[in-house]
Regions:
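Sec-dependent N-terminal signal peptides
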Residues: 5-15
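Bacterial Sec-pathway N-terminal export signals of envelope proteins
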Residues: 19-63, 98, 173, 212-254, ...
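Periplasmic alpha-helical coiled-coil/stalk elements that build and connect Gram-negative outer-membrane
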Residues: 21, 25, 121, 127-238, ...
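Surface positions of alpha-helical coiled-coils, especially the charged/polar e/g heptad sites
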Residues: 22, 29, 36, 99, ...
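A glycine-/polar-enriched beta->alpha junction
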Residues: 28-38, 45-60, 92-109, 119-126, ...
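Amphipathic alpha-helical coiled-coil segments
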Residues: 39-54, 124, 128-149, 158, ...
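Small/polar, glycine/serine/threonine/aspartate-rich low-complexity segments that form flexible
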Residues: 65-96, 220-229, 261, 274-308, ...
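Acidic, glycine-rich loop-and-beta core segments that form the ion-binding/anion-interacting portion
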Residues: 235-280
Length: 435
């Protein structure tokens, strides 16, 4: 019987560990099941198909038309005789574009769209690294808040139960008792709010990964966090050249410029080479009798645009404004990136100091808790004071963990700007987690 219970406990513990997810589980799951990633991947494939469609415009267009007819002559007046007969014909047409100046501009535009889609895909995969960490950090903070809420609720329950005993013995009034009751009931509501917030974060993870999170790890608050230092000017200079969003914006400028050039080129003539081969076979019965005919033609088609109601001129003007907007967006993005880098560096420096302060605060509260715990063993402190000390310790611990997670998240963002962000970064954070 004892062995059976032991095995059951081991199975429960192992099951809990198997179902618990870490940051890498969230990230790997997102690579396979994140819907936004699937859409961006399909967009990248679509851009390749658009490029193939554009490049195919330079190749000849070949078509075959076949026709068969059976003619029934009901009445005929004229020389000779004519009976029912049939006609079979086929025509092979080849059209080879020779001069279309806009083709190369359209091809350059399609090529830039392919490059942009690849950059967007790689950028989104990097964003998945940061988003995985951010969602997991939110889970940790929400779960820690629920745990602290439970301790606070226990403390309020002890105070309320003590107040009821004091009221029964006539030491406090019903007004004071109601205060303890209201505090307890309010704490119950606060705890339920924390539980609801935890569930909402779980749903965010479900949307992100398509998987329910049953259990998670926590951050080892005693571990030393490696603190990086960033130079703002160096980071800004590097980001303005190598950041994926900057590269994508530069390609937007190229795309709009090629579109404008293509629209301008459509004012010019186009030249096509046309060749046809015709075959017809008419059975006997027609006025001219049975006959077979083969013929071929070859020629050039020149299309000179003269008047289109101002349509093409308007398209050129439209594309010119798009080109200007693309350059404006690029300039605005550069300004935004500069601001974001400076904000992140300032937050990074602030959070480094805050983590040190929170760690000192935790050490002080932990020392107070140990003192009260030891004093409670010899009757110096009540159960209420022990619970309050436990709650204060948990709050201090949660504050330290939250500040540390905020620091790690800002550090990931700064690594993205420096193009040093990789999966190894969240693997390092993963090793800081404990059960």
């Amino acid at each position: 019987m004892y062995k059976s219970k032991l095995y059951l406990m081991i199975i429960i513990m192992l099951t809990s560990h198997v179902e618990a997810a870490d940051i890498m589980d969230v990230y790997n799951r997102s690579l396979n099941f994140n819907n936004d990633l699937k859409i961006i991947t399909n967009d990248q494939k679509i851009s390749q198909e658009v490029y193939s469609q554009t490049s195919s415009n330079i190749f000849p267009e070949v078509s075959i038309t076949a026709n068969t007819q059976e003619i029934n002559v009901n009445k005929y007046t004229g020389t000779g005789t004519q009976k029912d007969y049939s006609t079979e014909s086929a025509s092979l047409t080849i059209t080879q574009p020779l001069l279309r100046l806009y083709f190369f501009d359209e091809l350059n535009k399609a090529e830039s769209i392919v490059k942009k889609s690849k950059i967007n895909l790689e950028e989104f995969k990097k964003d998945l690294i940061i988003k995985s960490a951010e969602l997991y950090f939110n889970l940790i903070n929400a779960k820690n808040s629920v745990a602290a809420g439970e301790v606070k609720l226990d403390s309020m329950l002890i105070k309320y139960e003590s107040a009821k005993k004091l009221f029964d013995n006539g030491y406090i009034s019903d007004i004071e008792l109601n205060k303890y009751k209201n505090n307890y009931e309010m704490t119950m509501v606060e705890k339920q709010i924390l539980v609801n917030e935890f569930d909402m974060v779980k749903q965010d993870v479900y949307i992100f990964t398509g998987r329910e999170i049953l259990d998670i790890h926590n951050l080892n608050h005693t571990i030393e966090i490696p603190l990086s230092t960033y130079d703002a000017n160096s980071l800004i200079s590097k980001a303005l050249v190598s950041l994926d969003s900057i590269k994508s914006a530069l390609l937007d400028v190229n795309i709009s410029r090629d579109e404008m050039k293509s629209n301008k080129s459509k004012h010019y003539p186009t030249i096509d080479l046309n060749a046809t081969y015709d075959y017809s076979d008419t059975s006997s019965g027609s006025r001219l009798g049975k006959q077979t005919r083969e013929s071929n033609t070859i020629g050039l088609t020149i299309n000179i645009p003269i008047y289109q109601g101002g349509f093409q001129k308007s398209k050129v003007t439209e594309s010119r404004y798009k080109y200007k907007n693309a350059k404006i967006n690029l300039d605005h993005l550069r300004r935004t990136v500069r601001k974001e880098i400076l904000d992140n560096i300032n937050n990074h420096n602030l959070l480094k100091s805050l983590v040190i302060v929170k760690r000192d605060r935790y050490d002080d509260v932990n020392q107070d808790y140990l003192t009260i715990s030891h004093g409670a063993d010899i009757g110096l402190y009540t159960d209420v004071e022990i619970k309050d000390a436990e709650y204060n310790l948990m709050v201090a611990k949660n504050d330290l963990i939250k500040s540390t997670l905020d620091l790690l998240l800002v550090d990931l963002n700064l690594k993205k700007y420096s193009s040093n962000l990789s999966v190894e970064n969240i693997q390092t954070i993963n090793r800081m987690l404990v059960w």
